[in-house]
């Protein structure tokens, strides 16, 4: 209802009582439709869309957190340690001003409101308790479960000038008003009622506020064995008696979350008792009397409850009561066994909302999502450096401790942890411990085996949301989805050809690698062609048989000292020259390449016959001369006649030295070979050679 009041200056001031309710109702409608929601809060893998502005206006915790981030804020936040149903009820209050909850869950909701500093809810609950002083609060019976309905009083001054719904005096009026405003009543799940531990993880440590459901549990803080097994040690390992009032102890690493929250040391879970009152005192419960500390006798670590101490002591005794039925591996906690079992089943219950990647643990999901947000949530307490993943922080911490990263002894590659090194070592040893029982194929990693088994079963659980194509491996699906985006981020450095996937680029680079090797080989041969002709050897580019009257002519330079000839049983010889390189076969080209790759001064030319094809020379192993291309020297022609070849074949076991008789009238002379006994050449060039020595006149 609008009210108008005259002002002395003649101006009118119009006030609408319904405006604040209308704005809240509009926000709630937008939240349900997902319209203009600029933030996603994830609690126990449940996603809550919301508006940053309204959260900051309703919660001092969110307000300080957003203010600390400034302009680099993000859109996805993971709230650790909270209950999804409890947070949903609290978010409903922020958007409507009404709280609909069961009587047993109000304590946990109030503790969450205290931590998030939603003081309007705390004050509304205080007023509700004062106005309903009877032991049994007024309830609205829905499906047999008592439900407490709390709203802000109309006559209370709002903190931020926000209007609140009028206080309803009767249940019938309240019920009709809720129906008129189309409010949705959230029923609390039984699991919420059974939860007795509220854990909030922050950057500075772990803050635990235990809210008991019964007075006898307050006086005797014990836990049932079944609950003991399900509670991981990490929730209370860092407890310190000094943190009883809400001060978080300093831990070595910042805790697992996507966003870096406001330091918990500036907050108290139960709030300022002078201004806002204690949550437990409001609820009319007795405070748990202080008992003896649960301290570990081995390391002196302190725990809040004895069952946490019992779990911790297994780290000293080595007790692992939880055994895997598949491989027999033991674990100290039931939670660790459940995570391990997923390795056998392939279950990955945690899915990234950005890229749909599935992961086995919540911790893995938190670290993965930090890569999308770009937020570096893990802080080194020594130097203050930030990291996006916990393993990066652990690796960095070795700088302060002096410990080095695990290193492979074979290739000296370093790894983040020992488990990664262990997997890498299998690439050197060839070990493949994971074998498929169906086809016998082995793998180095268990994940590869699990993916392979899906092929036998025909399972393709990963489907593309665009074209519907299914895949047996999540990584294959991710690579496929990149094709739909049209992006090609991978570019070839050689030809600038772009690819959408990295594996396609690697396959493409192999083509350039082969071309480069072939180009290097041809450039080596081509660059030394002139030197080969001038300084080493030239034979006529044809094959001739010794059955005719033809002769073999060899052009050699003065730098040639010896020619070691090892004939085969065949009567024919074929050889390659530099001038005939364009007609070479692949084998001949390779042989000619060998001719140009020896570094020392020319001493021997070895012509060795091929065993399978004795008509052709298999290789020319010749050492280059050091003479430069600009130098000139006489070229001599050596003629090997039919008789000479026959003589070499007949006496290949004997050592002979052939002298050359020349004249100096022509730089290229035909030389006649004469035979004289001589010493054998060095035997390290060719086994059992028959040398032909050449002396220059």
From Swiss-Prot:
State the name under which the record lists this protein: Zinc finger and BTB domain-containing protein 24
Annotated tissue distribution:
Widely expressed, with highest levels in naive B-cells.
CDD domains listed in its UniProt record:
BTB_POZ_ZBTB24_ZNF450
Q: Which organism is it from?
A: Homo sapiens (Human)
Superkingdom in the source lineage: Eukaryota
Q: What gene does the UniProt entry assign to this protein?
A: ZBTB24
Give the C2H2-type zinc finger regions: 294-316, 322-344, 350-372, 378-400, 406-428, 434-456, 462-484, 490-512
- Principal localisation: nucleus
Q: Which GO terms describe its molecular function?
A: DNA-binding transcription factor activity; RNA polymerase II cis-regulatory region sequence-specific DNA binding; zinc ion binding
Give the protein family.
Answer: Belongs to the krueppel C2H2-type zinc-finger protein family.
Q: Which disease is it linked to?
A: Immunodeficiency-centromeric instability-facial anomalies syndrome 2: A rare disorder characterized by a variable immunodeficiency resulting in recurrent infections, facial anomalies, and branching of chromosomes 1, 9, and 16. Other variable symptoms include growth retardation, failure to thrive, and psychomotor retardation. Laboratory studies show limited hypomethylation of DNA in a small fraction of the genome in some, but not all, patients.
Keywords for this protein: Disease variant, DNA-binding, Metal-binding, Nucleus, Repeat, Transcription, Transcription regulation, Zinc, Zinc-finger
Q: How does it assemble?
A: Interacts with MN1.
PANTHER family from the xrefs?
Answer: AGAP004733-PA, LOW QUALITY PROTEIN: ZINC FINGER PROTEIN 721-RELATED
Q: What's a single GO CC term here?
A: nucleus
């Amino acid at each position: 209802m609008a009210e108008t009041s005259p002002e002395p200056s003649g101006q009118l001031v119009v006030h609408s009582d319904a405006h604040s309710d209308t704005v809240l109702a509009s926000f709630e409608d937008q939240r349900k439709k997902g319209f203009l929601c600029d933030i996603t809060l994830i609690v126990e893998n449940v996603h809550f869309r919301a508006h940053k502005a309204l959260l900051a206006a309703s919660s001092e915790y969110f307000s300080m957190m957003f203010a600390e981030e400034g302009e680099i804020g993000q859109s996805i936040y993971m709230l650790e340690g909270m209950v999804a149903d409890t947070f949903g009820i609290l978010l409903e209050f922020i958007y409507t001003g009404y709280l609909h909850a069961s009587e047993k869950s109000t304590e946990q909701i109030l503790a969450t409101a205290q931590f998030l500093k939603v003081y309007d809810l705390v004050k509304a609950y205080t007023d509700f308790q004062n106005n309903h002083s009877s032991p049994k609060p007024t309830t609205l019976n829905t499906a047999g479960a008592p439900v407490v309905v709390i709203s802000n009083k109309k006559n209370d001054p709002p903190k931020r000038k926000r209007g609140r719904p009028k206080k309803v005096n009767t249940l019938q009026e309240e019920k009709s008003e809720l129906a008129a405003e189309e409010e949705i009543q959230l029923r609390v799940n039984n699991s919420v009622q059974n939860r007795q531990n509220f854990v909030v993880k922050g950057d500075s440590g772990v803050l635990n506020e235990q809210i008991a459901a019964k007075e006898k549990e307050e006086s005797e803080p014990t836990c049932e064995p079944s609950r003991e097994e399900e509670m991981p040690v990490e929730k209370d390992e860092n407890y310190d008696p000094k943190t009883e009032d809400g001060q978080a102890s300093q831990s070595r690493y910042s805790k697992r979350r996507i966003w870096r929250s406001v330091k918990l040391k500036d907050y108290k879970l139960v709030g300022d008792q002078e201004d806002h009152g204690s949550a437990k005192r409001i609820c009319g419960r007795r405070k748990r009397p202080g008992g003896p500390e649960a301290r570990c006798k081995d390391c002196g670590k302190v725990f809040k409850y004895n069952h946490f101490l019992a779990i911790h002591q297994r780290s000293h005794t080595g007790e692992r009561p939880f055994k895997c039925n598949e491989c027999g591996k033991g674990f100290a906690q039931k939670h660790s066994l459940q995570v391990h079992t997923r390795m056998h089943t392939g279950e990955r219950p945690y899915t990234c909302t950005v890229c749909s990647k599935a992961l086995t643990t919540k911790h893995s999901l938190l670290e993965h999502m930090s890569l999308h947000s770009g937020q570096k949530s893990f802080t080194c307490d020594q130097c203050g450096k930030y990291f996006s993943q916990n393993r990066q922080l652990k690796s960095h911490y070795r700088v302060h401790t002096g410990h080095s990263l695990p290193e492979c002894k074979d290739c000296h590659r370093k790894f983040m942890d020992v488990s990664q090194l262990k997997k890498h070592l299998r690439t050197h040893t060839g070990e493949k411990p994971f074998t498929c029982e169906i086809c016998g194929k082995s793998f180095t990693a268990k994940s590869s085996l699990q993916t392979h088994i899906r092929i036998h079963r025909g399972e393709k659980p990963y489907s593309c949301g665009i074209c519907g194509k299914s895949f047996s491996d999540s990584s294959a699906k991710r690579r496929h989805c990149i094709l739909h985006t049209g992006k090609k981020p991978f570019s070839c450095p050689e030809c600038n050809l772009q690819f959408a996937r990295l594996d396609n680029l690697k396959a493409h680079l192999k083509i350039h690698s082969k071309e480069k090797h072939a180009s290097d080989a041809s450039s080596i041969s081509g660059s030394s062609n002139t030197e080969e002709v001038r300084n080493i050897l030239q034979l006529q580019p044809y094959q001739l048989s010794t059955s005719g009257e033809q002769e073999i002519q060899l052009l050699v330079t003065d730098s040639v000292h010896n020619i070691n000839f090892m004939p085969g049983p065949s009567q024919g010889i074929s050889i390659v020259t530099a001038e005939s390189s364009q007609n070479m076969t692949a084998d001949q080209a390779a042989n000619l390449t060998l001719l140009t790759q020896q570094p020392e001064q020319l001493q021997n030319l070895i012509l060795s016959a091929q065993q399978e094809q004795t008509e052709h020379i298999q290789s020319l192993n010749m050492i280059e001369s050091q003479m430069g291309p600009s130098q000139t020297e006489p070229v001599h022609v050596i003629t090997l006649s039919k008789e000479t070849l026959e003589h070499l074949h007949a006496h290949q076991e004997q050592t002979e030295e052939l002298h050359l008789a020349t004249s100096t009238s022509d730089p290229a002379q035909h030389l006649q070979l004469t035979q004289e006994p001589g010493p054998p050449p060095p035997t390290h060039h060719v086994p059992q050679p028959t040398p032909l020595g050449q002396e220059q006149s």
